[in-house]
């Protein structure tokens, strides 16, 4: 049956911690980059307001997912040199075929013993993952396949999956009761997949899911504009973010296909994670996104966005 729900959100680390602690990550991520005047206006009171909006937005996504009650959730994120690295392998597309993925809730640069102890497990739909992997290869998408959900080059080996999954999975499904299919895109390291390739990947996934007798949802996480530790660290390209969100709302896939064709510093760094949203947009086809919220937050170093695609709402 057709994919019945799409979800997307940002996964910048400060999205998941109290605003009182945002300064730690903010100072790490901006390095020596001069900051915009707007950053100084983000007082603790302002940051608390952003944090409240973030939690309300997650609540909307949680409610949509709980109401749909999918049999499986396809989760699309990117690798940050955690699962893969340039000395081993950096695939454009990778899929997890293991029985379960594990992770911990703490951020790798925070020495938080309590959070480090909070290991969680996501059960994976191995049969659906294998079906999608085989089908995508037949549709000329060359996938890397893995059965080991462990980080490679950042932090201790037992941290499990990268933070694109470990931070978002418990927020979306607190009971971790929906079998998942885990899919990685390369969004940081050249050569990068084009926007068209990402949209086509989503369309191919949707075509394969249509042949299944399962209720399936798809979730993309990352972005929007940000450049941690890069030359634009702390700066947010709000016009770009709003343009992308408007195109998603309009289901304007033709416009989105050209997104990364021009060479721009803005497209480098974390902004490339918009590719994960494009996979969802491709999977949802003519269904436009409902934009739940958007915030250009310098102390999160990110354009923070939340959206969902509900075909039933579009009828």
Predicted segment positions?
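Active-site microenvironments of hydrolase-like enzyme catalytic domains
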Residues: 73, 77-98, 225-226
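A contiguous pocket-lining binding segment that forms or flanks enzyme active sites
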Residues: 205-207, 215-217, 221, 225-241
